[in-house]
């Protein structure tokens, strides 16, 4: 009897430690350069649903000021009107920045795929497109490359970004356009949320938002084959309000109030506005999920839409996670953090990519293995 009990206990420990060893076998590092390169594939990918990270040869992005990297490096003088405070730091943008040493998805992919093209680099004066205020000829292709994001961008203006992206992409050899595998980060909605608190305009409804997303994705599907789109959810932008009580943010409130007046209105009106913003975020996330489900039910070998929740809990973030230009946009510190979270999620099943994102110090960077694939399946 005792022998049988001992055997069962021993078996339990063997299974437990074996499972633990398997779970811990995945390598996480502090710097992407510490990850070993992958051996070349023996056979080419069967479709966009069979991609290793080193199969990606083109990186692209559509979005707003966050993707443009506005204010990420912080202000350069103690006066708000310093011209450098109006710069987009595109080279450190979490999704597509290509500055040497920057912690970005683009640079992580380039570690495995050195011939990657499309990363944005450097800094330049803000490119503004906000509703009807959308001047032409702002793009700087030598720095922007395939980062089509513009500060202030709303879903109703997405065709402007898409036209720029198509124009730049089709300057490449047709081999690149038609056959190379591409990865596009699509992140939009924050400015729509910031504008909707007191404006029930038809072009800000969740239904119209969904239509804008789908029409944009349809053009991408038709015009940019062999593309995986990572469609990000929206987060509760209203959370930034609480940071403006911090000493770090004093003196810059007027800038943020201009950027998102709904979030910073005082008193009962401010409370109601922020509630409306959060409700809009929920509606928009449902719309985003509807779009993702649509493409999951219309599966294609040359086009896929992934879904990445962006449910960040800003109350867990250090105040330095916001840019000291306006205490509204993410700083390089937050760009780095989000990069690691989204990178680590790329090969995970959909059921493990969601959940509340809380701040962690020293997040490790996942090293991809030869059997890892970018997980395009949106269902658990």
How does the language model describe each region?
Residues 66, 72, 112, 147-153, ...:
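Cell-envelope and extracellular/periplasmic
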Residues 58-71, 118-119, 144-149, 182-187, ...:
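Structural recognition of the beta-strand scaffold that forms the well-ordered cores
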Residues 1-57, 61, 249, 258-380:
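Conserved catalytic region of serine esterases and O-acyltransferases that act on ester linkages
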Residues 182-183, 187-300, 309-312, 340-345:
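Extracytoplasmic, non-cytosolic globular domains
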Residues 53-73, 79, 99-101, 108, ...:
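Hydrophobic transmembrane alpha-helices of multi-pass solute transporters/permeases
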